[in-house]
């Protein structure tokens, strides 16, 4: 049993050039726009897909066998998309710190993620990816990892971002493991 994912790099490159970069020019200060990279964008997409497999699918709640999907009901897809995003960032940070991947990605992945968050949320919060990214953006703003600048652009505080992705990953993984709908 397993899964197979097909990623079309040329399609993602077109999304990056035609959608993400124009969004970054509006949403980020000029200096931060230099920290938006295709490698960080594409690598995070790959990690996002891998992270869908992270965590339990079958759990035990109150002595009964069930699934995370059954327990989380209509919130499951939103929480799953948020988990894949934030745990993907967490995993990339771990791999970069251990030099399993080029550590240079650490300089661009958070700012690229911020720009990409605006790309994802434009689909609205009536869709799982949009709701998931809205949760993450609000969490990052609350933790000071994302900040709104006086010119109404957005920036990343890398140090706070590292702590925020770790804590949000932990919260989501715990929520799923416990099947905590409330």
Language-model features: where?
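Alpha-helix capping and helix-loop boundary segments enriched in small/acidic/polar residues
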Residues: 30-41, 67-82, 101-105, 109
């Amino acid at each position: 049993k397993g899964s197979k994912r097909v990623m079309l790099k040329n399609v993602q490159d077109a999304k990056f050039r035609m959608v993400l970069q124009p969004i970054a020019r509006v949403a980020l200060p000029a200096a931060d726009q230099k920290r938006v990279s295709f490698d960080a964008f594409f690598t995070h997409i790959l990690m996002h897909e891998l992270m869908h497999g992270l965590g339990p699918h079958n759990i035990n709640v109150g002595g009964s066998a069930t699934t995370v999907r059954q327990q989380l009901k209509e919130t499951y897809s939103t929480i799953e998309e948020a988990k894949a995003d934030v745990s993907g960032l967490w995993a990339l940070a771990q791999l970069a710190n251990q030099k399993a991947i080029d550590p240079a990605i650490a300089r661009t992945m958070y700012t690229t993620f911020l720009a990409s968050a605006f790309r994802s949320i434009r689909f609205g919060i009536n869709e799982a990816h949009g709701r998931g990214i809205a949760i993450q953006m609000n969490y990052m703003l609350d933790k000071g990892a994302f900040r709104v600048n006086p010119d109404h652009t957005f920036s990343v505080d890398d140090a706070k971002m590292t702590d925020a992705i770790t804590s949000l990953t932990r919260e989501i993984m715990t929520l799923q493991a416990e099947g905590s709908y409330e």
